[in-house]
A protein has these predicted regions:
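Thiamine diphosphate
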Residues: 32-187
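Short, high-confidence coil segments that cap the C-terminus of an alpha-helix
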Residues: 23-24, 114
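Conserved thiamine diphosphate
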Residues: 1-22, 89, 160, 180-185
Length: 187
């Protein structure tokens, strides 16, 4: 069973192409606001595939590891751009699939380099962010490499708001991510 969480529609196509070549069931969690974005299409769109269980490093950095997926990945990238003006270098990792999850421990390798980690998720507290946290911190032993406490940023624990304005106040936003990471860098 696969649980796929693409960050955009090109990644979704790559995942669908991978699924067409397999015989296994899957759940595809598409980010709805991804339909409104313009993306550069690869020349090999029908052959393009995304490997499952292998996170992709979207941005290399040395100070902190940001782990996310789907729609919140763009928000994390905006926050990393803001933090760059303060000389904070963020490594951003897109998990791509929740099942299987990071089979080569790529997130752990990043944590060994940065010694700080934050998991960002648009789900409720205790959802996918907690799952990713458990996998990296407990199962892979990531706690051994921490200089500060690991953190999660999730949606607020209330009924989801409606519309883009509601998303800003209900789900993680770039300013919230920036503030938390600045705080972590001071510890």
């Amino acid at each position: 069973m696969y649980v796929c969480v693409p960050r955009n529609m090109v990644q979704a196509v790559g995942m669908y192409n991978t699924l067409l070549n397999s015989n296994d069931p899957a759940i595809m969690i598409e980010c709805l606001n991804g339909y409104r974005l313009k993306e550069k299409l690869p020349d090999n769109l029908l052959e393009f595939t995304v490997p499952f269980g292998i996170p992709e490093t979207i941005r290399h950095g040395t100070d902190i590891t940001i782990v996310s997926y789907g729609a919140t990945l763009r928000i994390a990238q905006n926050a990393a751009d803001m933090l760059e003006t303060f000389d904070i270098s963020c490594e951003i990792i897109d998990v791509q699939t929740l099942l299987p999850f990071d089979i080569h421990h790529k997130i752990l390798d990043s944590l060994k380099k940065t010694n700080r980690i934050v998991f960002i998720d648009e789900d409720v507290p205790g959802g996918a962010a907690a799952f990713m946290f458990n996998k990296v911190m407990e199962e892979q032993g990531g706690y051994r490499y921490l200089d500060v406490a690991p953190r999660t940023i999730t949606a607020k624990a209330h009924r989801p708001a409606y519309g883009s304005d509601g998303d800003y106040f209900s789900k993680p936003n770039a300013e919230e991510i920036e503030a938390l990471i600045k705080e972590m860098m001071k510890e």
